[in-house]
């Protein structure tokens, strides 16, 4: 494999970043994870826009290179990848070892790709089964403390949630995803996913006004549902709202749409709306990339 590091393609075992890089020292970096279908990054514009938003929030908006898409394409071509996982990172770069950043930024820009076959109607999903989801004590960091709508290299909030799953499982298999609440007790999101559920009133998902990261896949699902005329609501929901749902699923770029099998041991499962949204999502990918 070859990775793109600071404008050059390098072999995987030679791809390095300085120990003085602020992304390594402080998590002072922005990133995006996306899927590639048929050699073309899915929803590139939305991912590029969010990467820019994160960088601007962190104070180095000018550091995102204009030729970033070209670097992604070069990395895919160098590894002969058509269907792939891609991660793009932009850090503030190497600066003196102090917390206050220098205004002059020489960014570190890294593009990583690896094979990730498409699921779709005729393939196999990256997940094996519907997700087992478990509520954790870890709460979502309030946006007043750390903006929830950015993707920085500081991912400790999600890591702590996943660690809870491991510790609570003991010698058994941990749940696939944690269900994280905000400090007011509202359901927010998973460690790396957004949460949807279906009730008699229609499709529901926590509002972007809460402390959560509104994912690119989340936006697509909301768009597809509205195009189909489904009743859609975003709001503040309790754990019982999700536990008692008729259907529930998770979304992110890697999983796409993954049904939830259980929440805290309570069976929820998939259903007609989840299956239809999966099909509509697959059809959009097919139309745009194949």
Q: Model regions: which residues?
A:
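N-proximal low-complexity "stem/linker" segments adjacent to membrane-targeting elements
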Residues: 62-64
